[in-house]
Amino acid sequence: LRADVIASTWTVENLQTLISEGALSALMRDSRLPALVELAGATDPAAVLTRFFILGLPERTSALNEALPTLGARGLESLGLAATIDEAEASSALVMPPAGGAPKREPKEEREEASAPKASSLPTMRNPDEESPEPEVEADPWMRALFDLRPHAASLPGGDHEWWVASDLAEVQTGKPLSDDHVLGIGGATLTLLEMTVREHVDSALDVGCGCGIQALYLATHADRVVATDLSSRACALTQFNAALNEAVIDVREGSLFEPVEGETFDLIVTNPPFVITPDSVRGAAGLLEYRDGGMDRDNLIRAVLRGAPACMNEGGTLQMLANWEIPADRNPD
């Protein structure tokens, strides 16, 4: 996969030549239509991969084989990044979504069918050349992406980097509600933390709540040792996948906050925790997203981070994070 995306010149710079500034801006606002129109009929590899992974459009197996000549469509399926679909599903996906976007989130038990792929379909590092049963399919079947995958460019003091980052598909790509364990891609808060983080060389760095692993990828450019933790097994799997795809050495551990690194210390800790404060009135209700809700009342998650970080920091170490905190109505904020 890495060799193919490099050969395809599917980079941020190339993406900006394929799609106009206006269409890219619309895409940031969850509007695919301008980009869909501009890429309609384009056959070069970067355009095919953009339609497939970023816009969420089905593609024919033959088109994916041409875009990824080494891995091929069968290899994508073997890695858990794509699935074969029938003509009916492809036709419905090719129809433009309604202006209203995805349907309203329903109670968990009523929307299991609509949720994103679960752990059984996480991306894998399995060798796509391994033999596997080949079902009888049509000559050139349709395929759909199971994950968002897109290029990301980083200009850092140590040099420029071009990465490809996988995350869960968003509502705009699927037309379906997000699953509770949805792993977010690179959003505005993520970019804010990336920009504010000190990029001096350090011996060790820790990313708490790693999500798709983009903070850890940045840390790996200026830290000799990087550990990434997350309570979500799905987030850990995606971080491991992205580290392998981008040839980064990251020690990924599943667990809550600092529990996976108990007894260890670091020079730099970064965290973009689920800092949205969930009102008590909806606490415990179905449909709370893990990446937004940390599972603790009020701002107790942020309190836990601030109290737990010092024990994991070397002398002179740094903690950089984003946070919200609650100001009770009966307390003077000053």
Region spans (language model):
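S-adenosylmethionine
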Residues: 177-189, 199-201, 231-334
